[in-house]
Design a protein with these regions (language model features):
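Sec-dependent N-terminal signal peptides
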Residues: 3-18
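C-terminal segment of classical bacterial N-terminal signal peptides
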Residues: 18-31
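Extracellular/surface-exposed low-complexity segments
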Residues: 30-82, 402-491, 514-521
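Glycine-rich repeat segments that build the extracellular carbohydrate-interaction surface of secreted
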Residues: 74, 81-96, 106-113
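Well-ordered beta-strand segments characteristic of repetitive beta-sheet solenoids
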Residues: 88-90, 106-110, 132, 140-144, ...
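Extracellular beta-strand-rich solenoid/capping regions of secreted or surface-exposed proteins
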Residues: 95-107, 117-144, 153-169, 180-187, ...
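Beta-strand-rich solenoid/repeat architectures in extracellular/passenger domains
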Residues: 112-128, 143-159, 172-180, 194-207, ...
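Solvent-exposed beta-strand/loop surfaces, strongest in extracytoplasmic domains of secreted
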Residues: 486-526
Length: 526
């Protein structure tokens, strides 16, 4: 019904009331026909203001964000209704035969509706097959006041959900799904909420199932969920060379890849919060695969991830991994490094860090073939099948222990103590160990009598070390270096020969007589 007709009917209704043609119920309340009420309600709904904060729900709690529930949004039925900057909300589901190109500063509320790309070329570049394309210097903000709207492809896995081409993308709410990659970011992308889930990247030349961070661009994650995505590398997030990923909070969970189930980093990854959990890799890096560059972890947790070969929690092929906070726990690798597998370069952990509850065949907590500096922190409660329940150091590599390094209560096999396992020709460097430091030691070389195995290459206090095997003990050598040696054997004391004597021509033995005694008769000897 048009607004003009509605006004005419409203006028007739008022006239009927005044003329007494429409009877009033007791109390003076007029009951109009249901059809008229319905039309009036629809008209009122069409004219009602759509107001809410840009975060969609008013629940966002992040530094720098101030809620404004009075923001007014303009309803649209198609993207052709967007003529410039502004706040817009969907009044219905929208289907696109080609990508929508954002050229303005647009805040879009899905309002519980869907945006579906229906027509695409599987052989085209992901930018061409995107649902939404953010142009250079444009800004697109995605939110959803009803929290169940979605951006997707009708035919799964054929293009990006959102392609950011040197623009600005902010995600507060809503879902991006059923794409080859949820978000390809060649600009700046801040994620505060919402979900990127169920995307599968089958293209061999493109990595990243959830988010792909391109060269010289940044993805900052303050909240939200990246889950159930799949790719060859970086099931959750792939960071390309010279790209950068900063994770402050949020969840990366249930993603799968050949390498880097949760995150694959080729340049820079800073993690100060959030949780990377329950991701899986077919080969290396169930939680995180660090190909090169820098992985700096100052907080958050990497837990419950699985690798079919190396690095259940973290696999570092090269580059530097610095762990100054956070926890790596309950991860599993089929062969090496349940918590961390450090292949090359340096892995450093310090006070306030924990590696615990991880499992692998070798190196339940850490498997190291590079350089490992333990400046503090705790490696405990890890388990291996073969060797290195806490830490496995292969032959010819370096480990440094400083400050409050703790490697205790790790086991191998059937609950046998096995904490720091030193391969052949490996010595430990120590510096300024404190009273809280405690390191259990097992060596590949077996100590022999008068031939101990050297543990430290420099002078160190033996009180910070203990032997995992009770058959050995910790000692020091001529230059005060710590060694693992056989326990000193106690001197063998022969059983005493009992005194014998003859009494009444009968021989007696084992009778204690003391130093001074007298035999009354017969033959005797003292």
């Amino acid at each position: 019904m048009s607004k003009g007709i509605a006004k005419i009917l409203s006028g007739l209704l008022v006239f009927g009331m005044v003329a007494g043609l429409v009877p009033a119920a007791p109390g003076g309340i007029v009951h109009a026909k249901a059809a008229e009420i319905s039309e009036q309600d629809v008209t009122a709904a069409e004219n009602s203001e759509h107001k809410h904060c840009v975060c969609g729900t008013g629940k966002l709690s992040v530094e720098g964000h101030k809620h404004d529930e009075e923001q007014i949004w303009i309803g649209i039925s198609n993207f052709s209704d967007i003529k410039g900057d502004g706040n817009y909300y969907l009044k219905q589901d929208v289907k696109l035969e080609e990508k929508w190109k954002c050229e303005y500063r647009v805040n879009l509320c899905l309002n519980g509706h869907s945006i579906t790309r229906t027509n695409e070329n599987p052989d085209s570049h992901p930018a061409q097959n995107a649902v939404i394309y953010i142009d250079t210097n444009a800004m697109f903000t995605l939110t959803d006041c009803k929290e169940n709207g979605i951006i997707k492809h009708e035919a799964e896995n054929t293009g990006a959900g959102v392609y950011n081409s040197e623009g600005y993308f902010i995600m507060y709410n809503g879902m991006i799904s059923k794409s080859s990659c949820g978000v390809i970011n060649a600009g700046d992308f801040n994620m505060y909420g919402g979900t990127i889930s169920g995307n599968t990247n089958k293209n061999t030349y493109r990595y990243g199932g959830g988010v792909y961070v391109d060269t010289k661009h940044i993805f900052k994650m303050y909240g939200g969920t990246i889950s159930q995505n799949t790719a060859a590398r970086g099931g959750g997030v792939y960071v390309h060379k010279q790209g950068e990923f900063q994770m402050y909070d949020g969840l990366i969970s249930g993603n799968k890849a050949d390498y880097g189930g949760g995150v694959y980093n080729s340049n820079t990854f800073y993690m100060s919060g959030g949780n990377i959990t329950n991701n899986t890799s077919k080969t290396s890096g169930g939680g995180v695969y660090n190909e090169a560059g820098t992985f700096d972890m100052s907080g958050g947790t990497i837990t419950g991830n699985t690798s079919n070969q190396y690095g259940g929690g973290v696999f570092k092929a090269s580059g530097n991994f610095t762990m100054s906070g956070g926890e790596i726990s309950n991860n599993t690798a089929a062969t090496q490094g349940g918590g961390v597998s450090n292949l090359n370069d340096t892995f450093t952990m310090s006070d306030g860090t924990t590696i615990s509850g991880n499992k692998a065949m070798y190196g339940g907590g850490v498997y190291n073939t590079g350089r490992f500096d333990i400046l503090g922190g705790m490696i405990t409660g890890n388990q291996s099948d073969k060797a290195g329940g806490g830490v496995f150091l292969s032959s010819g590599n370096t480990i440094t222990l400083k400050n409050t390094a703790i490697i205790i209560e790790n086991t191998v096999g059937d609950n046998i103590n096995n904490n720091l396992y030193l391969g052949s020709n490996i010595t430990v460097q120590t510096e300024s160990l404190t009273d809280k430091a405690c390191i259990g030691v097992t060596t590949k070389e077996t100590p022999k009598e008068n031939s101990p195995v050297t543990i430290t290459s420099d002078a160190a206090s033996a009180e910070y070390f203990r032997a995992d095997n009770s058959a050995y003990e910790i000692g020091t050598d001529a230059v005060a270096g710590v060694v693992l040696k056989c326990k000193e054997k106690l001197p063998i004391v022969p059983d005493p020969v009992p005194n014998r004597f003859t009494y009444d021509e009968t021989e007696h033995a084992g009778i204690e007589l003391g130093e001074n005694y007298t035999v009354a008769s017969g033959t005797n000897s003292a």
